Amino acid sequence: MHCPFCGANDTKVIDSRLVAEGEQVRRRRECLACGERFTTFETAELVLPRLIKTDGSRQPFDEEKLRAGMQRALEKRPVSVERLESSLVHIKHKLRATGEREVKSLVVGELVMAELQKLDEVAYIRFASVYRRFQDLNEFREEIDRLAREPVKE
């Protein structure tokens, strides 16, 4: 680490502590050349994978697009913003946990459906009807019957 005072390359870590709920490391450093002390903060760069669309095109992950789609499904439903944000964090965590640089958009769609099913079954059906392109009432009935049979996976 370069010293911000004299530009020397040799610094020594005097103290390290976790801060920001363990998301950051605070380090107290001392320059071996000039003796000045300074603080650095380190955070991991967590990059979300790019999405591979069904047509084969690739695009960066867009959190706002994800949020808007979920909000549309949850419109006029009794789900708090906090619960929605928690679901978004959960989806992003699962995407990062894949360790992949690219994931199929279908993976994101399935993660959204799983989260919406936990949040609100009506919102889940709304999203599923568009996502899975329901063509008639029978497809709605089949999905509702499946929901009634299968417990929600936490």
Swiss-Prot record:
Disulfide bonds: none annotated. PANTHER family: TRANSCRIPTIONAL REPRESSOR NRDR (PTHR30455:SF2). Binds 1 zinc ion. Keywords: ATP-binding, DNA-binding, Metal-binding, Nucleotide-binding, Repressor, Transcription, Transcription regulation, Zinc, Zinc-finger. GO terms for biological process: negative regulation of DNA-templated transcription. HAMAP family: NrdR (MF_00440). Its cofactor is Zn(2+). It comes from the Bacteria. Negatively regulates transcription of bacterial ribonucleotide reductase nrd genes and operons by binding to NrdR-boxes. PROSITE patterns: ATP_CONE. NCBIfam families: transcriptional regulator NrdR (TIGR00244). InterPro entries: ATP-cone_dom, NrdR-like_N, RNR_NrdR-like. This is Transcriptional repressor NrdR. GO terms for molecular function: ATP binding; DNA binding; zinc ion binding. Residues 49-139 form the ATP-cone domain. Coiled coil: none annotated. A zinc finger (unnamed) spans 3-34. Belongs to the NrdR family.
